[in-house]
């Protein structure tokens, strides 16, 4: 097992990465506030891992809540289901919530923990690659709204993130690929050597090599922990973690949440960001080709939905949380390993990019 730390003064917390961690009661115990625990999971993960975790936490008074799986259920309605379960169970501030699942469950449970009685502790137990390398770390919690993704939420840090790489053995190949979009993102924005390593070892990741999985999870979490420690509430460098997300969130919202997995939309959005950089003279043809090739090798889309127009994108992108004073701001790569935030890219450039990437 390896341990990383997100350094946020008195709110600092560990990230544990290893195999078989779901069965380690000693790992959970220091991060559980009292005797009561509510495990929230979904109907895909529950048959696989809920009983395992219940057995691990056998010494506690455990309630469980099983929600429907999928991005379509990351809603205020699901949030209210969690609230109702907590209230009906007369849970207090000494209850610890545990998010057992992927990014949707983690975001939902984190938001519920932030709001219930103005804040109760929670633990992230991510079971998908995307949640293990990205969404479980950093305290972003939210639900979607029909008019925009992650528009209702809070910054609220977990007490711990417990990453069991064995959970990836039951992950469908499409979900594994979706998680790779976030892994590749870290190479593009932060670490050129890591990007090169991914080019050489993508097949090891796809064959679920424990060493390769540990490597990518630890590297991504280390980068994110560093960024979050510098900029917890996304006023500066943390915005770089949104490479591909402004285009990608527009795809998700326009297509209907769940039609495109988050990672698939981010992959297409990353290509659109790279093409924007190319047209602005920020990025070389060679780097754009390498980005596309690695995304393709990871079984991710490199073209966006054919039925989306420029107006469809802008309708959603102007609601993006990075926008300021009505002006669009985009994270754009300047080289593999380096990116920055750019304001007010010309509409003619965006139109050309959107036309070229469908």
Curated annotation (Swiss-Prot):
It catalyses: 7-phospho-2-dehydro-3-deoxy-D-arabino-heptonate = 3-dehydroquinate + phosphate. Keywords: Amino-acid biosynthesis, Aromatic amino acid biosynthesis, Cobalt, Cytoplasm, Lyase, Metal-binding, NAD, Nucleotide-binding, Zinc. One of its GO terms (molecular function) is 3-dehydroquinate synthase activity. It is found in: Cytoplasm. It is an enzyme of class 4 (lyase). Binds 1 divalent metal cation per subunit. Can use either Co(2+) or Zn(2+). One of its GO terms (cellular component) is cytoplasm. Zn(2+) binds at residues 182, 245, 262. The keyword Phosphoprotein does not apply. Transmembrane segments: none annotated. Pathway: Metabolic intermediate biosynthesis; chorismate biosynthesis; chorismate from D-erythrose 4-phosphate and phosphoenolpyruvate: step 2/7. Its EC number is 4.2.3.4. GO terms for biological process: amino acid biosynthetic process; aromatic amino acid family biosynthetic process; chorismate biosynthetic process. Pfam families: DHQ_synthase, DHQS_C. Its cofactor is Co(2+); Zn(2+); NAD(+). InterPro entries: Dehydroquinate_synthase, DHQ_synth_AroB, DHQ_synth_fam, DHQS/DOIS_N, DHQS_C. NAD(+) binds at residues 69-74, 103-107, 127-128, 140, 149, 167-170. Belongs to the sugar phosphate cyclases superfamily. Dehydroquinate synthase family. HAMAP family: DHQ_synthase. Catalyzes the conversion of 3-deoxy-D-arabino-heptulosonate 7-phosphate (DAHP) to dehydroquinate (DHQ). This is 3-dehydroquinate synthase. It comes from Tolumonas auensis (strain DSM 9187 / NBRC 110442 / TA 4).
